[in-house]
Amino acid sequence: MAALAMAALLPGPATAASTVTQVAAGLDSPRGIGFVDGRMVVAEAGHGGPNCFFVPNGPPFPFCIGDTSQVSWVNTTTGGHEPIVKHLFSISLGPEGTLGASGLSVRDGKIYVLMGSTPQEAPPDSAIAQEEAGRLISINPSTKSWMSVAKVGETDFNFTLPFTQPTQGVYSPGTQEHDANPYGVLAVPGGFYTADAGSNTLDWVGNDGKIKILHHFDWRDLDPNNFPSDDVPTCVAIANGSWWVGNLSGHLYRLDMNGHVTQVVPRNDSGPLLHHVTGCTTDSKGNLYLVNMFGPGIPFTPPFFVGSVVKYQTGSGQASVLAGNLFTPNMPAIGPDGNLYVTAGSICDAAGTSPAPPGAPNPCAGGGKVLKISLPRA
């Protein structure tokens, strides 16, 4: 099961590129973020649950399923938060983190959320996994109820089955894991674009729930031991008449109206600025904002765990770092005040349980968070 591998490091202060302030804390693995009529909503992936199982020929630790995921209102003035819907599917993958409510997008007063994972990779007797894993769901905030829109994870997993799977530790072009993990969603008139981090696909989901695979990202790292060794698309945004897809590999792709795919490398004088992207959004001026959950360097050793937020001007090609030294930031959204809001501490549970070794500083103190990054008004 493809997951965004996670670990811990105490972050330093944000860079001086923009003012960064904490809006809320005490969230449970916060991921997607958006606004409904000016009110903030956040998807919380949760912390799994008590129903554990071992994957055959898998890692030496159990995966644990529960109903601890939820979608919550967040008060940007007081920092308070309360669930709109709760008891959603969540699966803890041990040291690899948690999957649950992931990408979030708002359209016409409804909240649309992608649930991570897929039912094929869960025990068949897990009712909540079979009914909710990998689903695109629609939430009515007025009634605090939800309904399923489409079986994105199930469809994407089935798409991967005809592929030969990569050989572990060997460069394997043309291969694809049999996997799915729907992650990013963008609601538009008529339907939804979804990015699947497991199947490496960009999908179109119609309002009727019908799913079409628009593109399969088949890049493979020449060094199969790098993290990640495939693209792992995590987000999709629209700017200047093109679709932009961010990837955990650090790749950014532009897809035009004719279906042409071009890799774009935002950079400044220091070099390329994208490392491990988990979220992206745009503003009304065509600027693209991308969240690096992790930084450069050797995977899972400092300073790898320090993320950043990058601004890319899709018209001019100029790029800059808005904020750095952020602990596992995840997804962004432009707020009604014109500033950028980002979930952070996305591997942290609400209680702030430390993932660090005993005696080390706790980077999750205060639990998952929402940060505000000031944007210029010009």
List each language-model region with its residue ranges.
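Beta-propeller fold detector
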Residues: 21-24, 80-88, 144-161, 212-219, ...
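Beta-rich, blade/repeat-based domains predominating
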Residues: 26-38, 68, 90-110, 157-192, ...
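Short loop/turn segments that connect beta-strands within beta-propeller blades
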Residues: 75-79, 139-144, 205-210, 255-260, ...
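A gly/proline- and charged-residue-enriched helix-loop-helix capping module
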Residues: 99, 107, 114-169
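A short loop-to-beta-strand structural motif that recurs across blades of beta-propeller domains
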Residues: 59-63, 67-73, 132-137, 201-204, ...
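Short, conserved, GDST-rich strand-edge loop motifs in beta-rich repeat architectures
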Residues: 43-68, 113-135, 182-183, 232-234, ...
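Secretory targeting and sorting signals
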Residues: 1-16
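Loop/turn residues immediately N-terminal
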Residues: 199-201, 249-251, 295, 347
